[in-house]
Amino acid sequence: MRCPYCGYEETRVLDSRVDSSGMTVRRRRECVKCKGRFTTYERYEFGPVFVVKKDGKREKFDRAKILNGVMKACEKTNVTLEEIEKLVDDVVNDVQKSGNLEILTLEIGKLVMEKLKKLNGVAYVRFASVYKDFREIDQFLEVVEELKKEK
């Protein structure tokens, strides 16, 4: 593994942990040369899954897009990076376990919302506002009222 700080090719593993899903290994590494420390993640790689967009276009499933959306929704909340990573891993695992070669963006959005609702109400409302393309304040209020009823 190449060091991201100095580019040296020799690093050593300080710590390895498997996440609760058993699908990801987190490794803490240290560069032998500059002593810089960094974290790497190892995940299973399944066959390609394609996402069918609202306009009918298809593109390769991209975990990073889900991660970016969830991170934006969780900004300035008490949700940790580990919780975000786990949520995204769970969504990816659900998509891969389905065995489908294609999935609609709407289905991915539903999976994310289902998991965000359990994790953090504010992040859920933020994500819902983009996913459902809110145009009026009443749409926000409806989602907030729905959350209140469930608690």
Curated annotation (Swiss-Prot):
Keywords: ATP-binding, DNA-binding, Metal-binding, Nucleotide-binding, Repressor, Transcription, Transcription regulation, Zinc, Zinc-finger
Record keyword Aminoacyl-tRNA synthetase present: no
UniProt record, GO biological process: negative regulation of DNA-templated transcription
Organism superkingdom: Bacteria
GO molecular function terms attached to this record: ATP binding; DNA binding; zinc ion binding
InterPro entries xrefs: ATP-cone_dom, NrdR-like_N, RNR_NrdR-like
Pfam family for this entry, one: Zn_ribbon_NrdR
Cofactor note: Binds 1 zinc ion.
UniProt xrefs under NCBIfam families: transcriptional regulator NrdR
Protein name per its UniProtKB record: Transcriptional repressor NrdR
